UniProtKB/Swiss-Prot annotation:
The lineage of its organism: Bacteria, Bacillati, Bacillota, Bacilli, Lactobacillales. It is an enzyme of class 2 (transferase). Its cofactor is Mg(2+). The keyword Amino-acid biosynthesis does not apply. The gene is acpS. Keywords: Cytoplasm, Fatty acid biosynthesis, Fatty acid metabolism, Lipid biosynthesis, Lipid metabolism, Magnesium, Metal-binding, Transferase. GO terms for cellular component: cytoplasm. It is found in: Cytoplasm. Transfers the 4'-phosphopantetheine moiety from coenzyme A to a Ser of acyl-carrier-protein. NCBIfam families: acpS, pantethn_trn. One of its GO terms (molecular function) is holo-[acyl-carrier-protein] synthase activity. This is Holo-[acyl-carrier-protein] synthase.
């Protein structure tokens, strides 16, 4: 049974402005593994990746119902499976989780569905 659904839409240019003012912003948002992937990309791809992870983590926080206020960005990790699809590899939710991240132009959108294991 679905117990939560969260959606987030983010402008990549807004993330870029924050990142330009504070390059440590990526360290606040990304886990150690995510940061290693982020650092392997050229600049434009870094922005897209960072915005996607931001949006995915915001969508997760909305799906679980707490918002980021009760979670930290470090509580949630989004990596890719062998096909390149995003997966939630770390979160406080014990059921099944499904995530989709889509990029189009200056926007990134993420959707997270949480499902009870019963």
């Amino acid at each position: 049974m679905i117990v939560g659904h969260g959606i987030d839409l983010q402008e990549i240019s807004a993330i870029e402005k924050v990142y330009q003012r504070n390059p440590r912003f990526a360290q606040k948002i990304l886990t150690e593994q995510e940061l290693a992937i982020f650092e392997s990309f050229p600049y434009k791809r870094r922005l897209s990746y960072l915005a996607g992870r931001w949006s995915g983590k915001e969508a997760f926080a909305k799906a679980i119902g707490t918002g980021i206020g009760r979670l930290t960005f470090q509580d949630i990790e989004i990596l890719n499976d062998v096909r390149g699809c995003p997966i939630l590899t770390k979160s406080p939710f014990k059921g099944n989780s499904f995530i989709s991240i889509s990029h189009s132009g200056n926007y990134v959108q993420a959707s997270v569905i949480l499902e009870d294991k019963k």
